Amino acid sequence: FNYDGNKYYLHEDGHMEDNALNVNGTMYLFKSWGGMCVNDVGSYNGNYYYVGADGAVSTTTGWKKIKTSTQTIWYWATADGGKLLTNSWLDYNGNSYYLKADGKMAFNEWLDNTYYFRSWGAAYKNAWAKVNNVWYYFDGNGKKYTSGWLTYKGNKYYLKSDGTMLANEWLDGKYYFKSWGGMYKNEWGKSGDTWYWFNADGTKRTQKGWFLYDKNYYYLDKDGKMLTGWVYHDGNYYYMKSWGGMAHDEWILHDKNWYYFKSWGGMYHDQWLTLNGS
């Protein structure tokens, strides 16, 4: 009988069914308070089953969907009388899914802090995933990569022991990683307010002195920092511009004073300068 929007079943002795009922080979499930399961999941003998709009337990194999006011929940019904798959992996159409203890498909969540599932349920494999603003890489088996260096599409990355990708961070004081994770190599990189040169193998250049790049001379200290402003080297004063390049063949205004620098960068001082005939 129907009451307050729910269906109930009363036996001949008057007691209300609150478990399961087999009618001509069709199984119906009831909640503990007596209402019949409709468009829902019910349990019987320690197993979960999907129940359709007619209240009958579905015996067809495949995905089953239940929509709530906030989300869509997916289940997988097995060929074993429609029992829902629980605590198990499912390989389907080239993707791997995980059905939890209650039969619900995992999505947007971790499993054993090792696997992570997309919004539509498939485990990430051979792919990057951003979780809570942190990037992780998952190998071909879907496991979070925690083995250090990773080469991916021509770039080198570093994954820490917890699997998080280094970004805007140093490794061993020698390597530095971009905001998107790639390691700097054969290029300038900025950490904080300081520029560094990174060699082809990614290590920071720490050879103190001059460095020629793209027809400009730069000066690096022993820690690899690119210097700006005044530099004193081998008895001569040089001036490094705000972007690092050495001034030469030009005037520089510094602290309200003008200075002129030779073709090789040294500052003129204590001598006459003839320039443009003057």
Segments predicted by a language model, with ranges:
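Extracellular adhesion/carbohydrate-binding repeat motifs centered on closely spaced tryptophans
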Residues: 1-278
